[in-house]
A protein has these predicted regions:
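Extracytoplasmic gate region of multi-pass secondary transporters
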Residues: 51-55, 257-312
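C-terminal transmembrane helical hairpin of 12-TM major facilitator-type secondary transporters
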Residues: 324-368
C-alpha cells in the first residue's frame, strides 16, 4: 500500500449495515468519532504547550535564553500557520482518522526527543547552541504536526453530522484547545516542579501517544466506510448547491471570498494576544511578579478554563442577547480583552487578582 492509498479518504464498505440497525449503528459510531476526535485534539494542545511550561527552568539552568526560546516558539507558530493553511485543503481528500493520528503521534515523538536531549546536556554533553538548534528544528516540525489536528477534526463534523447540528458540535469541539491548555499547565507544571523540565516534555509525549491511540480506537473516517448510508441519506437533508460541487471548486470559491481574508486577519491578531498569554504568561508571572512555577502554571490554567466558558457562551450571547448580531458581542469582547490584558501586564495584585485578570481575558477571547 502506497502513501497516497494509505491516506486517501476511505472507500465505501461492501458490507452494508442491515436497515433495522442503521439508526443505532450510526448514532454509536457518530458519538465515538466525535468524542474520540475531541478528546484527542485536546491532547494535541498538551504536546503544543509543553515548551511554555518549561521556559523558566531552561533559563535558570543556563541552557537557553529568553530570546532563543522566543525564536524556538516562533518556529512552531510560523510553520503551524503555513501547515494549517495547506493541511486544511489536503485533509478534504484524506482519511481523517489516519491523518489526525499521524500528526499527534509525530508531535509526541518530537516532545519525547526534546525531553531526552535534556539528559545529554552538561559540561561533558551537548553544548547549549546545539540544544538551541535542535529545539528550533524539532519545534518547527512540531508546528507542522500540530497543523494536522484541527482540519480533520472539523471535517469529521461534515462527514458525520447533518448541517443543522454542526454548529452545536463545533462549539464543543472548538473549546478543546482550552481543555488541552488547562491539562498542560496543571499536569505538566506539577511534573516539571517535581522532577525537572525534561519530564515536562516526556509527560506531554505520553499524552500525545494516548491521544493517537484514542483516534485509532474510536474515530471512523466516513459513515460509508462502515457500511452506512451517506450523512444526507441518514439525516434526510437535501444537498445544497455547494454540497454538489467538487471539493476543488469549493476551495477556489473560499479563497476568492474577501470576507474569509478579513476574518483570517482578525483571527491572526486575536491569536497574537492569546499565544502571548498562553506561551509567555507562566514566564512573565515568574520573572515580573515573582510567582513560583506551581502558582504561575495554576494562574494560566484558570485562563484556559475560562476560555472554555467564553467559547461555549459565545453562541448563546449572540443568539439570545444580541438577537443574532455577531458584530456587537465581538466588539465588546475585544474591548474587554484589551482591558483585561492591560490589567494583567501593568496592575499589581496577588494570586487571586491575577487569576481574575487572565480569566477575564480568556473569557473575552473565547467569545471572539
Amino acid at each position: 500500500m502506497g502513501l497516497y492509498s494509505f491516506y486517501r479518504i476511505s472507500k465505501p464498505s461492501a458490507d452494508k449495515v442491515p436497515q433495522e440497525r442503521v439508526a443505532a449503528e450510526y448514532k454509536a459510531l457518530r458519538n465515538r468519532t466525535f468524542w474520540g476526535a475531541t478528546a484527542a485534539y485536546s491532547l494535541y494542545y498538551v504536546c503544543r504547550m509543553s515548551l511554555s511550561v518549561v521556559k523558566q527552568p531552561l533559563i535558570d539552568e543556563g541552557i537557553l535564553s529568553a530570546g532563543q526560546l522566543g525564536l524556538i516558539g516562533s518556529a512552531l507558530l510560523f510553520v503551524y500557520a503555513v501547515g494549517k493553511f495547506m493541511n486544511g485543503f489536503i485533509a478534504d481528500y484524506c482519511n481523517m482518522k489516519r491523518f489526525m493520528a499521524t500528526g499527534l503521534f509525530i508531535s509526541a515523538a518530537v516532545n519525547l526527543i526534546m525531553g531526552a536531549l535534556g539528559f545529554f546536556h552538561g559540561p561533558a554533553g551537548l553544548p547549549s547552541m546545539l540544544i538551541f538548534i535542535a529545539f528550533a528544528v524539532l519545534w518547527g516540525i512540531n508546528g507542522w504536526m500540530q497543523s494536522m489536528g484541527s482540519p480533520p477534526g472539523v471535517i469529521s463534523l461534515s462527514r458525520w453530522f447533518p448541517r443543522s447540528k454542526r454548529g452545536t458540535y463545533y462549539s464543543i469541539f472548538s473549546s478543546t484547545p482550552y481543555v488541552g491548555e488547562f491539562l498542560s499547565f496543571i499536569i505538566t507544571g506539577m511534573v516539571v516542579g517535581a522532577f525537572g523540565w525534561e519530564y515536562g516534555f516526556i509527560v506531554a509525549a505520553a499524552a500525545g501517544l494516548v491521544g493517537s491511540a484514542v483516534i485509532l480506537l474510536f474515530v471512523s473516517d466516513t459513515p460509508e466506510s462502515k457500511g452506512l448510508p451517506s450523512i444526507y441519506e441518514l439525516s434526510g437533508e437535501q444537498k445544497t448547491k455547494e454540497d454538489q460541487m467538487a471539493t476543488k471548486e469549493l476551495q477556489k470559491i473560499v479563497l476568492r471570498h474577501p470576507g474569509i481574508w478579513i476574518i483570517a486577519l482578525s483571527s491572526a491578531f486575536i491569536y497574537i494576544t492569546k499565544y502571548a498569554v498562553a506561551g509567555w504568561g507562566v514566564l512573565f508571572l515568574q520573572k515580573a511578579k515573582d510567582f513560583p512555577l506551581e502558582e504561575a502554571t495554576q494562574i494560566i490554567a484558570f485562563s484556559a478554563a475560562f476560555g472554555v466558558v467564553g467559547t461555549v457562551l459565545a453562541g448563546w450571547l449572540s443568539d439570545r442577547i444580541f438577537k443574532g448580531d455577531r458584530v456587537k458581542p465581538a466588539i465588546l469582547s475585544g474591548v474587554l480583552s484589551f482591558i483585561a490584558l492591560a490589567l494583567f501586564l501593568f496592575a499589581g495584585g496577588g494570586y487571586v487578582m491575577n487569576i481574575f485578570y487572565v480569566s477575564l481575558f480568556s473569557l473575552a477571547v473565547g467569545v471572539l
